[in-house]
Amino acid sequence: MSINPILDASSAIKVHTLAASFALTLGPFIFTPKARGKLHKFLGYIWILAMATTAISSFFIYGFKLIWVFSPIHFLSIFILFGLCRAFWYIRNGNVIGHARTMLGMYWYGVLAAGIFTLLPGRMLNRALFPEAPWLGYLFIACGALLIIRHIRRESAGLVG
């Protein structure tokens, strides 16, 4: 493992990576069924800040242009920013289920699903995490895809959120 690819990246990528890593790490503490009360609320505000920072910083990253300067990550960032507002609106209006589903959706698809693609060989995180064996990125992508498929099946069966 080498931190050099991250240190050599632009400031926007550094901020984006740090904020996304923070959101990824906080998720399990916030989204457990027993996470309620003041700690949940406090960590939730921090998670919202991390997600907003991740989304906003992506608008300064221009690696994969699809339409003009925009890439799929930019469209995901718009989705995340609207999702954060929606989740906040839900909880302010007492819709706990809508809030939980929106927040979990952003975690599963905005953090985990999007995050596994950063492990593709040639990408910065792949070079940082697997400099000697870039193919390991595919292994982590496969494991992440299996987790997401499991989540989708559980969600469609009504077992989550």
Question: PLM features: what roles do these ranges have?
Answer:
Residues 1-161:
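Alpha-helical membrane insertion/targeting regions
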